[in-house]
From Swiss-Prot:
Keywords in alphabetical order: Activator, DNA-binding, Early protein, G1/S host cell cycle checkpoint dysregulation by virus, Host cytoplasm, Host nucleus, Host-virus interaction, Inhibition of host innate immune response by virus, Inhibition of host interferon signaling pathway by virus, Interferon antiviral system evasion, Metal-binding, Modulation of host cell cycle by virus, Oncogene, Transcription, Transcription regulation, Viral immunoevasion, Zinc, Zinc-finger
Superkingdom of source: Viruses
Gene3D superfamilies from the UniProt entry: 3.30.160.330
One matching Pfam family: E7
SUPFAM superfamilies: E7 C-terminal domain-like
Protein name: Protein E7
Stretches assigned to coiled coil: none
Gene Ontology biological process terms from the UniProt entry: DNA-templated transcription; symbiont-mediated perturbation of host cell cycle G1/S transition checkpoint; symbiont-mediated suppression of host innate immune response; symbiont-mediated suppression of host type I interferon-mediated signaling pathway
Post-translational modification: Highly phosphorylated.
Keyword match Zinc-finger: yes
Organismal lineage: Viruses, Monodnaviria, Shotokuvirae, Cossaviricota, Papovaviricetes
A GO CC annotation given for this chain: host cell cytoplasm
Zinc finger residue extent: unnamed: 65-101
């Protein structure tokens, strides 16, 4: 750098590869022509096995009280499909009431 401010000519980077050996980035893997897809680990054809139930996961939802509009944090544990069915109830008539409004009734 020459002077108090840097100029573009002062900040020129010369990038060069660290190794001179060229690296082949192509994948030379060949897939088998078998019609059945086998699992790599156990060799079992999973297409004919019954479907496993999805593992439940924890989901956090922020809802509003239908009376005072206070925020309510709801935590459920379910599969993604069951959670989707639960969310469909919100589109109909299902509403939540906060503990304070529930105690006032």
């Amino acid at each position: 750098m020459h002077g108090p401010k840097a100029t573009l000519q002062d900040i020129v980077l010369h990038l060069e590869p660290q190794n001179e050996i060229p690296v082949d980035l192509l994948c030379h893997e060949q897939l088998s022509d078998s019609e059945e897809e086998n699992d790599e680990i156990d060799g079992v054809n999973h297409q004919h096995l019954p479907a496993r139930r999805a593992e439940p996961q924890r989901h956090t939802m922020l809802c509003m009280c239908c009376k005072c509009e206070a925020r309510i944090k709801l935590v459920v544990e379910s599969s993604a499909d069951d959670l989707r069915a639960f969310q469909q109830l919100f589109l109909n008539t299902l509403s939540f009431v906060c503990p304070w409004c529930a105690s006032q009734q």
